Structure formats: structure tokens, C-alpha cells
């Protein structure tokens, strides 16, 4: 295309075009006035909205040649590429709009159905009192809870906490975490979150009423990181060690506990940690149980002191905290820090990667599912700002602000929520350590070039490093501290400064844009931002008025703030959107007024501190006017400074921790139920039948239920309206039904003659035997038929016949079948219940033990397990929703009245609602059902099993893998002594059986067809969570034999060769 030099001119003009035109009809006006410019049109209509730094980089490459013809060809190609990008962007925007519309319709439909279930008329209560009631989304820094506003208030609060001795567990598993000399910025995983969790742990450990805080993270012993990250334990020294030392005990204080998991000699990115989460959970569970027993000896009168809460930070730790919360039955808290759905939306808008590429790079779908599970399991979700709730959390299926408001109104009026739950959103801004901050006092007009009155205290070196840029260093400093990222909007700040002459005459501009050596060594994005800044400095001739030092240390940052305050300057954060804005709090603590973006967290900070002005980050003139107003107005500057210093204590760590502990105090206490009674069998090593019978009686006679609804009796609702008499009657009926059924099974078993095979070595003391086994073999093979399961079971038993006869190996059968189906299965295979120590039934919602001591039957149900997993169980409300969903699926997809799936009453139990699937191909994927239930605030674990022929819905924190952790907690059966046998695929809970500290044997050739059915439409690929090259996992050869299984066990070091 001849004459393409004109493209060069308008591409050059891109650098001067703002982020968008205020007048959408500007091009039409130009045409009407007869001054239409194709250059202007191209820039306005096609390029506007793209990142100008990227376009500039492409332009530089395109015009970097002396040959006019070659340059024209390059520019022509670039022109068409930009045009194509514009079309792709429009397409992506359309797809995004469709996604949002679909999500909105799904949410509105779910909200209508959820509201219809709650028949009582609470229209006034559901609307809420905006003035007097707590916000529907959580509490801001000025909520109804009393704040620390004076020393007296703090002392009063401290006196109220004196008698408490709380144990709190925090989890943050990625990055490099240590208490001192944190390597912030070393990589993308070691950033602000690391600093936040360390300071939170340290501050909580110093609070009255808190005995111990454990921050659990990953132990890293890689050669390319410091040795300190491999230390198992590190104590966090309190900053104010003299305040609460009187109450310190032997194991009290705050500690970093490093749990070994994942590759032992590698430091890996957080995206690669997902397959190793179960291993971390097992290691963390071991530590918490051990520490709870230690604290019990010190402060609990011999009874374990369980954590009052487990707090996960970021999605990976949230997933871990949910599993630990379920395993221990203690409350969970969650802080997202950065949310996956928001990141996914941003990446899709950038149009640089497809959805599949995004997931491959960031494992984003696994991360989103972990965040959804965190919403399911959390009592409280802690956020920094209201923006995080209103614009980020509302993207999730598991959180709906409108439905949350309705549920809260019902709870306040003590009306049943029909099994629906929504976590409490609490806005608690991060705290800050003020021990190193000394705000400037007195007259601020002193010299800045040195401290002549006190030569013993020279100015910090960073001051001279900044001052050398200025021709007049006495002018007030406008300070911006941000990395060179397009989102931080630094170029607009420089333009605002450069085009406002009064501002240039009154002030200097200091840009602290990270650390750099050479521009060529920076990332492409950072280099582009820096080059744009340098070009603007040259364009506006700002030499001598703008400082941009290359290096600074973390310890220099307070001195930089002090310099700006000393010169009566202003701190500015002009980011397009700021999730929180910790630098604004730091600036206020040093006596600096602020100018900040009106998008995001700064709004909440400004509401509390009232120490500056908010601006539209897209409005260059607004930024310049706000800066000029503060720099020129001495009274306004002084008032903003005073307000900031007066209110900054609201962002201190003691204030944060006080609100934090108040939130925890509002959680309903939960901990292992059997700890409330004298359970002699739990830790006893006795082999006597009496010990066994005491355990059996303890299980049989202590029924722990929270009953809601006519079928389940287990909603977990705080607002249950059942009377004590009804609860007792229902317990009695349930116990009698279980015992009567078990007697019938015993009679049938005796008639069939299947009791001939009795383990003579275990004798009567079945439960102690479970704990004395050298190894426990867990058969979790999900076959398409009972014949396949029976064949696999017999092969496994025959492979270790000698060890089984000696009593060193015990067996657990873990399936999706009911106990009745298991009994029929055992009879058909001529097996005895006594061949197994325990039975995990209904995908992990029921736990039975075999026994020969009781005349009531061969199976004993563990009712304590029910109380352990009943958290947030939806009961009858959940069942009705599932029945309605099944009917809708049939109406939508079935032809000629055929049923797709139907409720299976005979397969359902109090904690498992089962559905028989007649048309597996027409059944929606498991992720769709999970979504439907989450939108309606129903928290449960949906499992497609038996190759898609059955759907089991069980409590949200129940599973077959969690049942194994319960056995460890309840009976002390070491997880490392367990061997789990699985097929090549299995039910949709298959992935949970693979990871962990237990050993896994994959039986090749078994369940190989299941993956084509129920794993085809997963939210994320199974490969994202499969531990690769784990020493704990072995595979047998295809069509494994008994000898193959034994060889695999020898390979794991479990059997002697």
C-alpha cells in the first residue's frame, strides 16, 4: 500500500490520546465540519481502549528500518493486525456480555426458587434497616462493633479477654515466608500477602486472650533458597514484647510452622501446588492434633485444646482450611487476597490468551473451585474493602448479596432458613505496624538539604538520592509509590503534572517505581511504562522537577514518606482501581495528606481517615486540581494531616485483631464431639473386650444430631425450631431403627453361614485392633459392577493373605453403596463383615464398624461421625430442591415421558440423598448441579458415582478421604499406615483419594471406562490435581494379578521382598 507514511504519524499520535473520548460522536462531528481525518478516526474508533504501551512497542519495531518500502510494508501489516484485534475485542466484549447476562438470569432464577422455599412473609425484615442495621455485605471500619478509640477502651477490652486462652491457626502455603528480612518481591508468590500473614500472626500472638497462633506454610529445602525456609519451626518475636509477657506460657506465642509437602528439593510456583494440597492437609492435621494435646496438658486440664478457628489465605490455603475444618470440626475463616473469577474476567478482556490457555497457565478453574468451596465452608469471609464484596465476590455462585440479606433477616427473627447458608462478609482493613514510624512534629518549613542543628543525625541517604534530581529541593514533594504497571496509571499522573503550570511551579514530583538496573533488563510491560514516563518528562521539559531513582531498599520507604511530609507534600495513588491501598495508610501514618483513586479500597480508607481527596483516575484535570488544592491550601493540608494522624489508630494491628477476635467470638463453637464425654477407648491401649464394648456403647448411646426437617434431622442451622422433646424422640426412633435393621442382618448372616470366616487373631477387641494394625488397606475401587469390585477385593486380600491372617493388616471398604448393599455384596462374595474393620458408606456420609461382640448385629454405626460432618447440611430443604431439580431435568431433556433421574428413597439416608440415573447421557455434569445448589445457598458435596448411574448428595465437608482423616482423629489410625486401592478412574470424588501422606495403589485395567462418562465435563482437568511422580503412588501392570498387587506393595516398602 503506497504512501503508508501517514500511518506512522497517527500511530505516533497514539501516545497523546487519552483512555477514551468523552464524546462518542466526535468522528461524526469532524465529518460534518469538513475536517474529517482518517488518522484521527483510526485512533479514536479502532485503537482506543488498547494498552498504548503495547502499541508503542509495536510501532517502534515496525518503523525501525531505513528502507521506506520495508517500513511501509511493516506498517501496513501492523495496521491490519490492529484492525483485527479491534474486531476480536468487540467479539470478546459480546461474549462477556452474554456470560454476564446468563449469570444474572441463573442467579435471579435461583434467588426466586430459594425465596419461594422460604414461605414466611419477611418483606420488611428482608429489606433491612439501612440506617440502623448492619450492612448486608459486612461491617466497615465504622460498624456497630465498638472501636478502640482510646487507651481506656483498649484496657477495658484487655481486661475482658484475660481469662481466655485461644489457639488460632492461620494458613498461607505459597511463597517464601519467614519472620524477619522478608524477601518481598523476589517472585510473584512472595508479595504483600506474605507480609500480611506474618504481621497478622505476630499481632494476634501478642493479643490478650490468645495463647498460641500457628502460621502454617510450606517447608522449602531447595538449594536456590535460603536455609531458613527449611526450618520446621520459627518463633515470631512480638514487636511490643513487654506488653503481655506476663501471661506467656511454655508453648504460647506466634510461630511459623513449615509443613513438608510437594517436591522436597524444589521451590515451585503456587500454580503447581494443587496436586499436593492433600499432603499438606494431612501434615497440618498431624501438627494440629499434636499441638492440641500439648496445649491440653498446659492449659486444658488434660483435654485437647482445639483451634478456635482455622483461617485460610488465598485459594490454595482456603481449600486446605476447608478440609482441615471438616476433619477437625472447627470453624473456618477465609481471606481471598486475590480472586480467581476477577482475574479470569480481566485476562479474557485483554484477549491475549484463550480460556484454555489461561487455565493451562494459571490453573484458574481449580483456583475458582477452591474459592467456591471456601465460601461453602467458611463461617466468615474477611475482606479489606466493600469493593471486594460488591464487584468481586458477587461473581461467585456461592455468594449473593440479596439472598444473604434475606437469610440474615430470617436469622435475626429466629425463622428457619430451610437449610440455606451464606457466609458472613466482614470488612476488616489490614493492620499496620507503627513501631518504626515517628511523624514529623512542629514547623515543617525547615531545611531539607541537611540537619545542621543536629549533625549527629544526618539526613537519610535516600533523601539525597531523590534531591539530586531537583533544581529547587525546597518545594513540596508529590509522592507516588507504585510499580511501573499500566494499571497504576503513572503516565496520567505525569501528564497531569506536566500540563498544570501552577502545580509545576509549586511542587516537585517523585516517582518511586520499584528497583531497576537497566531498562533492557526489565519486563516488557514495566519497560514500556518507564519509557512512556521518560518521554513525557522530555515532552513537558520536566527536568529538575521529577525524581525517579533507580534503587531503594524496603527500609528506605518510611524515610521517603518522611521526606514528603517534611516538605509539606502530598501522597497520590492514581491507580485505575486499587483493591485496598496499604500505601495510603502508610502515608497517613507519616502525616501525609492523600489524593487517591475513587475506585476501590481508597473510598473506605478515606471514609475513616478523612485526610485527602478522591479523584477519577481517568480525569487528568481532576488529578491536577486535587494536587494543586492540597499543595496550595495550607489550612486544608494541615487539617488533612491532623485527621490522618488522629484516626490512623483505626488501622493498627491491635485494632484489626480486636475486631478479628470479636468476629471469631461470634462463631458457633465446634470441635470433636466425643471430647465432651469421658471416652476411655480413644487413647487406651487395652486389648480387653471391655475396652471394645465401652467404645461401642459410647458410639451407640451418644447420638449427636441437629435435627431439621422430617427426613434428615441434620440441618446444622442455628435457627432450628425443633423442641428438645422432638429431637429426643427422633433420636430414639433412629437408634431403634438402626439396631432393629442390624439384628435382621445378623439373622440373615447366620442363616447364610457366611460367619464361618472369622478373624481369630483380632478376637473381640475390634476397635483397639483397628488402632493396633501395622497397616490399613482401604479398598476404594469404583467398579461399574459389584462383580468387578468383588474380584478386585479378593485379589487384594489374597495378595496379603499371610499378613492378614497374622492380624498385622486390617481392611476398610470405602464405596458409594449403602450398608445394606454392602451386606448383600459380602454375602454374594462369601465374605464376612469381620473381614473388615470399618465400612465407609454412601460416598463418605456414613461410617460403620464390624463387631462380633454385640448381639445387635454385625455392624455398629458411628453416630459421632454424623455430628462431625453435619455442618451446613441442608436437610429437608435441600432434599426438596434436589427433587425439583430432578423433575426439571426430566421435563427439559426427556422424551415421551421417560425419566432421566429419580429420587432413590431406599438408597437415601439421613446424610445422603441418593438419585437413580436412568439416562446418564442426559444428566447435566456434576459442576452444573453444584452451581444450581450454590446459587440457592445450599452447601453440600455432590458426587456422581457408579459410572453415572447414581447421584449421591452428602454434607459439604464429608467425603471418603475425609472419613479416613476422621479415623485418624478419632482412633489414632496413622494416615501414613494406610494404603488406598483405586482403579484407573472412579466416582467424581476420585481425586481426593489420590493425594496425601497415605500410599496409593492404582489398579490398571479397572474402572478405565468411567472417565469417559462422569469426568468428561469437569470444571478443571484431572491432570491439574494428579500428583505426578509421587513416591507414594504406584500403578500395577494392565489387568493386574495378585502377584502384581504384591509387587506394588513391595515397591512401596510395605512388604518384605
Swiss-Prot record:
Biased composition, class Basic and acidic residues, residue ranges: 103-115
Pathway: Glycan biosynthesis; sucrose biosynthesis; sucrose from D-fructose 6-phosphate and UDP-alpha-D-glucose: step 1/2
Keywords: Glycosyltransferase, Transferase
Family to which the UniProt record says this protein belongs: Belongs to the glycosyltransferase 1 family.
GO MF annotations in UniProt: sucrose-phosphate synthase activity
Pfam families in the cross-refs: Glycos_transf_1, GT-B_Sucrose_synth, S6PP
Ranges of biased composition (kind: Acidic residues): 442-452
GO biological process terms held by the UniProt record: sucrose biosynthetic process
Reactions listed under catalytic activity: beta-D-fructose 6-phosphate + UDP-alpha-D-glucose = sucrose 6(F)-phosphate + UDP + H(+)
EC number(s) given by UniProt: 2.4.1.14
Region (Disordered): 103-143, 439-459, 670-693
Protein name: Probable sucrose-phosphate synthase 1
InterPro entries: Glyco_trans_1, HAD_sf, SPP-like_dom, SPS, SPS_C, SPS_pln, Sucrose_synth_GT-B1
Record entry for activity regulation: Activity is regulated by phosphorylation and moderated by concentration of metabolites and light.
Subunit structure: Homodimer or homotetramer.
Role according to the record: Plays a role in photosynthetic sucrose synthesis by catalyzing the rate-limiting step of sucrose biosynthesis from UDP-glucose and fructose- 6-phosphate. Involved in the regulation of carbon partitioning in the leaves of plants. May regulate the synthesis of sucrose and therefore play a major role as a limiting factor in the export of photoassimilates out of the leaf. Plays a role for sucrose availability that is essential for plant growth and fiber elongation.
Amino acid at each position: 500500500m503506497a504512501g503508508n507514511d501517514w500511518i506512522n504519524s497517527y500511530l505516533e499520535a497514539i501516545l497523546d490520546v487519552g483512555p477514551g473520548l468523552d464524546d462518542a460522536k466526535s468522528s461524526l462531528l469532524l465529518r460534518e465540519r469538513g475536517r474529517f481525518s482518517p488518522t484521527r478516526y483510526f485512533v479514536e474508533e479502532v485503537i482506543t481502549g488498547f494498552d498504548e504501551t503495547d502499541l508503542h512497542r509495536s510501532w517502534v519495531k515496525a518503523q525501525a528500518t531505513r528502507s521506506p518500502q520495508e517500513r511501509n510494508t511493516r506498517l501496513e501489516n501492523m495496521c491490519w493486525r490492529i484492525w483485527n484485534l479491534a474486531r476480536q475485542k468487540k467479539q470478546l466484549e459480546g461474549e462477556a456480555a452474554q456470560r454476564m447476562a446468563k449469570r444474572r438470569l441463573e442467579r435471579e432464577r435461583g434467588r426466586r426458587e430459594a425465596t419461594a422455599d422460604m414461605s414466611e412473609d419477611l418483606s420488611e425484615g428482608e429489606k433491612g434497616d439501612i440506617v440502623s442495621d448492619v450492612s448486608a455485605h459486612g461491617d466497615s471500619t465504622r460498624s456497630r462493633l465498638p472501636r478502640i478509640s482510646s487507651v481506656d477502651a483498649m484496657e477495658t477490652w484487655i481486661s475482658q479477654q484475660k481469662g481466655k486462652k485461644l489457639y488460632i491457626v492461620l494458613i498461607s502455603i505459597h511463597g517464601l515466608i519467614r519472620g524477619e528480612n522478608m524477601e518481598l518481591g523476589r517472585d510473584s508468590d512472595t508479595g504483600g500477602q506474605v507480609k500480611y500473614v506474618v504481621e497478622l500472626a505476630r499481632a494476634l500472638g501478642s493479643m490478650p486472650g490468645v495463647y498460641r497462633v500457628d502460621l502454617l506454610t510450606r517447608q522449602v529445602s531447595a538449594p536456590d533458597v535460603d536455609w531458613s525456609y527449611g526450618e520446621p519451626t520459627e518463633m515470631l518475636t512480638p514487636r511490643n514484647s513487654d506488653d503481655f509477657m506476663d501471661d506467656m506460657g511454655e508453648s504460647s506465642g506466634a510461630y511459623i510452622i513449615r509443613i513438608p509437602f510437594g517436591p522436597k528439593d524444589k521451590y515451585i510456583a503456587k500454580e503447581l501446588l494443587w496436586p499436593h494440597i492433600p499432603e499438606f492437609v494431612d501434615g497440618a492435621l498431624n501438627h494440629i492434633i499434636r499441638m492440641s494435646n500439648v496445649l491440653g496438658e498446659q492449659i486444658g486440664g488434660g483435654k485437647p485444646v482445639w483451634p478456635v478457628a482455622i483461617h485460610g489465605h488465598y485459594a490454595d490455603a482456603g481449600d486446605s482450611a476447608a478440609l482441615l475444618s471438616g476433619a477437625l470440626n472447627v470453624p473456618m475463616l477465609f481471606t481471598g487476597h486475590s480472586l480467581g473469577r476477577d482475574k479470569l474476567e480481566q485476562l479474557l478482556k485483554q484477549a491475549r490468551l484463550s480460556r484454555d490457555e489461561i487455565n493451562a497457565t494459571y490453573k484458574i478453574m481449580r483456583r475458582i473451585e477452591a474459592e467456591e468451596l471456601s465460601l461453602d465452608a467458611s463461617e466468615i469471609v474477611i475482606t479489606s474493602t466493600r469493593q471486594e464484596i460488591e464487584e468481586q465476590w458477587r461473581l461467585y455462585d456461592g455468594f449473593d448479596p440479596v439472598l444473604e440479606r434475606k437469610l440474615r433477616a430470617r436469622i435475626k427473627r429466629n425463622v428457619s432458613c430451610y437449610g440455606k447458608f451464606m457466609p458472613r462478609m466482614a470488612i476488616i482493613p489490614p493492620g499496620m505496624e507503627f513501631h518504626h514510624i515517628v511523624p514529623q512534629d512542629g514547623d515543617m518549613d525547615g531545611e531539607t538539604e541537611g540537619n545542621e542543628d543536629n549533625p549527629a543525625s544526618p539526613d537519610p541517604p535516600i533523601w539525597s538520592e531523590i534531591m539530586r534530581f531537583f533544581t529547587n529541593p525546597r518545594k513540596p514533594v508529590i509522592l507516588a509509590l507504585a510499580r511501573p504497571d499500566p494499571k497504576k496509571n503513572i503516565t496520567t499522573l505525569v501528564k497531569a503534572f506536566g500540563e498544570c503550570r501552577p502545580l509545576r511551579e509549586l511542587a516537585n514530583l517523585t516517582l518511586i517505581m520499584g528497583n531497576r538496573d537497566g531498562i533492557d533488563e526489565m519486563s516488557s510491560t514495566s519497560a514500556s511504562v518507564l519509557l512512556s514516563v521518560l518521554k513525557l518528562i522530555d515532552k513537558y521539559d520536566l527536568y529538575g522537577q521529577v525524581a525517579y531513582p533507580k534503587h531503594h531498599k524496603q527500609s528506605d520507604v518510611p524515610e521517603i514518606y518522611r521526606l514528603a511530609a517534611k516538605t509539606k507534600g502530598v501522597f497520590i495513588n492514581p491507580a485505575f482501581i486499587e483493591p485496598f491501598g496499604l500505601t495510603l495508610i502508610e502515608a497517613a501514618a507519616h502525616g501525609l495528606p492523600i489524593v487517591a483513586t475513587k475506585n476501590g479500597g481508597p473510598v473506605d480508607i478515606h471514609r475513616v481517615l478523612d485526610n485527602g481527596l478522591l479523584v477519577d483516575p481517568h480525569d487528568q484535570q481532576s488529578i491536577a486540581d486535587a494536587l494543586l488544592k492540597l499543595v496550595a491550601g495550607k489550612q486544608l493540608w494541615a487539617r488533612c494531616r491532623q485527621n490522618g494522624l488522629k484516626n490512623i489508630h483505626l488501622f493498627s494491628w491491635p485494632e484489626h485483631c480486636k475486631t478479628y477476635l470479636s468476629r471469631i467470638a461470634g462463631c458457633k463453637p465446634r470441635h470433636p464431639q466425643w471430647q465432651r464425654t469421658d471416652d476411655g477407648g480413644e487413647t487406651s491401649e487395652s486389648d480387653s473386650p471391655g475396652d471394645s464394648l465401652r467404645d461401642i456403647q459410647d458410639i451407640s448411646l451418644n447420638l449427636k444430631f441437629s435435627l431439621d426437617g422430617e427426613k434428615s434431622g441434620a440441618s446444622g442451622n442455628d435457627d432450628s425450631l425443633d423442641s428438645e422433646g422432638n429431637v429426643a424422640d427422633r433420636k430414639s426412633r433412629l437408634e431403634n431403627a438402626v439396631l432393629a435393621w442390624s439384628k435382621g442382618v445378623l439373622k440373615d448372616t447366620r442363616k447364610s453361614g457366611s460367619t464361618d470366616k472369622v478373624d481369630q487373631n483380632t478376637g473381640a477387641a475390634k476397635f483397639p485392633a483397628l488402632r493396633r494394625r501395622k497397616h490399613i488397606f482401604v479398598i476404594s475401587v469404583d467398579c461399574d459392577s459389584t462383580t468387578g469390585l468383588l474380584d478386585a477385593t479378593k485379589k487384594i486380600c489374597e495378595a496379603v493373605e499371610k499378613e492378614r491372617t497374622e492380624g498385622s493388616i486390617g481392611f476398610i471398604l470405602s464405596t458409594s453403596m449403602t450398608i445394606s448393599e454392602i451386606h448383600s455384596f459380602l454375602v454374594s462374595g462369601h465374605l464376612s463383615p469381620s473381614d473388615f474393620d470399618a465400612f465407609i458408606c454412601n460416598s463418605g456420609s456414613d461410617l460403620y464398624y464390624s463387631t462380633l461382640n454385640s448381639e445387635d448385629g454385625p455392624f455398629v454405626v458411628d453416630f459421632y461421625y454424623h455430628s462431625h460432618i453435619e455442618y451446613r447440611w441442608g436437610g429437608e430443604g435441600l432434599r426438596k430442591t434436589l427433587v425439583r431439580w430432578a423433575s426439571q431435568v426430566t421435563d427439559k431433556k426427556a422424551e415421551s415421558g421417560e425419566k432421566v433421574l429419580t429420587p432413590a428413597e431406599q438408597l437415601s439416608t439421613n446424610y445422603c440423598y441418593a438419585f437413580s440415573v436412568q439416562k446418564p447421557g442426559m444428566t447435566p455434569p456434576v459442576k452444573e448441579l453444584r452451581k444450581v445448589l450454590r446459587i440457592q445457598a445450599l452447601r453440600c458435596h455432590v458426587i456422581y458415582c457408579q459410572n453415572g448411574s447414581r447421584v449421591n448428595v452428602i454434607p459439604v465437608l464429608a467425603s471418603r478421604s475425609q472419613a479416613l482423616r476422621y479415623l485418624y482423629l478419632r482412633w489414632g489410625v496413622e494416615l501414613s499406615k494406610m494404603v488406598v486401592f483405586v482403579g484407573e478412574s472412579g466416582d467424581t470424588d476420585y481425586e481426593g483419594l489420590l493425594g496425601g501422606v497415605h500410599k496409593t495403589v492404582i489398579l490398571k485395567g479397572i474402572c478405565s471406562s468411567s472417565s469417559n462418562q462422569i469426568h468428561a465435563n469437569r470444571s478443571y482437568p484431572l491432570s491439574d490435581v494428579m500428583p505426578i511422580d509421587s513416591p507414594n503412588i504406584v500403578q500395577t501392570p494392565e489387568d493386574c494379578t495378585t502377584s502384581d498387587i504384591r509387587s506394588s506393595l513391595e515397591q512401596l516398602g510395605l512388604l518384605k521382598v
